[in-house]
UniProtKB/Swiss-Prot annotation:
Subunit structure: Monomer.
PANTHER family to which the protein is assigned, alphabetical: ACYL-COENZYME A THIOESTERASE 1-RELATED (PTHR10824:SF16), ACYL-COENZYME A THIOESTERASE-RELATED (PTHR10824)
Reactions the enzyme catalyzes: hexadecanoyl-CoA + H2O = hexadecanoate + CoA + H(+); decanoyl-CoA + H2O = decanoate + CoA + H(+); dodecanoyl-CoA + H2O = dodecanoate + CoA + H(+); tetradecanoyl-CoA + H2O = tetradecanoate + CoA + H(+)
GO biological process terms on file: acyl-CoA metabolic process; fatty acid metabolic process; long-chain fatty acid metabolic process; very long-chain fatty acid metabolic process
Signal peptide range in chain numbering: none
Residue ranges that the Swiss-Prot or TrEMBL entry lists as coiled coil: none
Annotated pathway: Lipid metabolism; fatty acid metabolism
GO CC terms in record: cytosol; mitochondrion
Active site: S232 (charge relay system), D326 (charge relay system), H360 (charge relay system)
Name this polypeptide is given: Acyl-coenzyme A thioesterase 1
Subcellular location: Cytoplasm, Cytosol
Primary location: cytoplasm
Pfam families (alphabetical): BAAT_C (PF08840), Bile_Hydr_Trans (PF04775)
Length: 421
């Protein structure tokens, strides 16, 4: 009997869904190596492997069988995905076109490392980013540039503005996945995209206000307010938007700063200068990468206090998702300082969830940890922090937490789209 790889759901599923991996038709207690590989849109290769042993019936189920070593060890049913590593260093797995899936090739090889033997079976597994029926609508309204994703069922839906960080451009994959959970989500670009400013030297909150108003006026978005979701600089912008703008009910800040960073922020007659930077505080790792965690000045001292975002003006509810091993900046410190400022002014205490051994890029589930890559503002490779397994577990939990938070504070019902298509 030939060995067969069995996936459930078979064939394809949404990127944020777990897949059950099993092998049948092996010899009793046969040692095998499972290998996963994936190429991103630019052709960069990511790989992971793990050693296993079949049971007495010649079967192997990754939900029951621990990995004996390789890219990971122990009972990790999704390890072959979250443990993927780039063949070349400094490559972060990013999905730029959500209309096409990423294909993972899974292989079963006879024996164990260092030299597993012949290929026993292989299967191609597609993971898509546009859930079935989710509608994708490019947005060019006034100055606003982005993409709106709407669930398949009739609206209106709770609305969310979704923003990424200093890489600029427009990333849609988090918004498209979240639309599959019953939200109307607009991925918003704010610089280095189409006719938007090329740099972050000066950002005007009026632009973001226009985006919020666009979403609130959309016939398939229910008010009276919207949610904000942002990571890194995008998380910091969520704090600024909630502090200065009307129409914001709830905000999720993933590893954001409580100080304005990287450029001047303007709104009407007010200006927030960027917090000061001291490049002498850059450390260098043994791999030669920069560790910039101490580079920014404290927004609690001296002239840098002017960069502190006036969160006490915000009327929205906050959820801070914090990686305690974030090496981009001091995310836990920032979340705690925002909490202190809010409570000192009688505002509602925010929810803060801290994840140990978790780095800067807390992504949707099953994205592999990016250990280091080029930082757009620093101009050289930096480390982002995190340990692969802990970071992977944090991503699964954070994804659930932010959905629960938005459903609670924006209303709506928890919708999920069946995975089988």
């Amino acid at each position: 009997m030939a060995a067969t790889l069995i996936l459930e759901p078979a064939g394809r599923c949404c990127w944020d869904e777990p897949v059950r991996i099993a092998v049948r038709g092996l010899a009793p207690e046969q040692p095998v190596t499972l290998r996963a590989s994936l190429r991103d849109e630019k052709g960069a290769l990511f790989q992971a492997h793990a050693r296993y042993r079949a049971d007495t019936l010649g079967e192997l189920d990754l939900e029951r069988a621990p990995a004996l070593g390789g890219s990971f060890a122990g009972l990790e049913p999704m390890g072959l995905l979250w443990a993927l590593e780039p063949e070349k260093p400094l490559v972060r797995l990013v999905k730029r076109d959500v209309r096409t899936p990423l294909a993972v090739e899974l292989e079963v090889l006879d024996g164990h490392d260092p030299d597993p033997g012949r290929l026993l079976c292989r299967v191609r597994h597609e993971r898509y980013f546009l859930p079935p029926g989710v509608r994708r609508e490019p947005v060019r309204a006034g100055r606003v540039r982005g993409t709106l994703f709407l669930p398949p069922e009739p609206g209106p839906f709770p609305g969310i503005v979704d923003m990424f960080g200093t890489g600029g451009g427009l990333l849609e994959y988090r918004a498209s996945l979240l639309a599959g959970k019953g939200f109307a989500v607009m991925a918003l670009a704010y610089y280095n995209y189409e006719d938007l400013p090329k740099t972050m030297e000066t950002l005007h909150l009026e632009y973001f206000e226009e985006a919020v108003n666009y979403l609130l006026s959309h016939p398939e978005v229910k008010g009276p307010g919207v949610g904000l979701l942002g990571i890194s600089k995008g998380g910091e912008l969520c704090l600024s938007m909630a502090s200065f703008l009307k129409g914001i009910t709830a905000a999720v800040v993933i590893n954001g700063s409580v100080a304005n960073v990287g450029g001047t922020l303007r709104y009407k007659g007010e200006t927030l200068p960027p917090v000061g930077v001291n490049r002498n505080r850059i450390k260098v790792t043994k791999d030669g990468y920069a560790d910039i965690v101490d580079v920014l000045n404290s927004p609690l001292e001296g002239p840098d206090q002017k960069s502190f975002i006036p969160v006490e003006r915000a009327e929205s509810t906050f959820l801070f998702l914090v990686g305690q091993d974030d090496h981009n900046w001091k995310s836990e410190f920032y979340a705690n300082e925002a909490c202190k400022r809010l409570q000192a002014h009688g505002r509602r205490k925010p929810q803060i969830i801290c994840y140990p051994e978790t780095g800067h890029y807390i992504e949707p589930p099953y994205f592999p940890l990016c250990r280091a890559s080029l930082h757009a503002l620093v101009g050289s490779p930096i480390i982002w922090g995190g340990e692969p397994r802990a970071h992977a577990m944090a991503q699964v939990d954070a994804w659930k937490q932010l959905q629960t938070f938005f459903h609670k504070h924006l209303g709506g019902h928890e919708g999920t789209i069946p995975s089988k298509v």
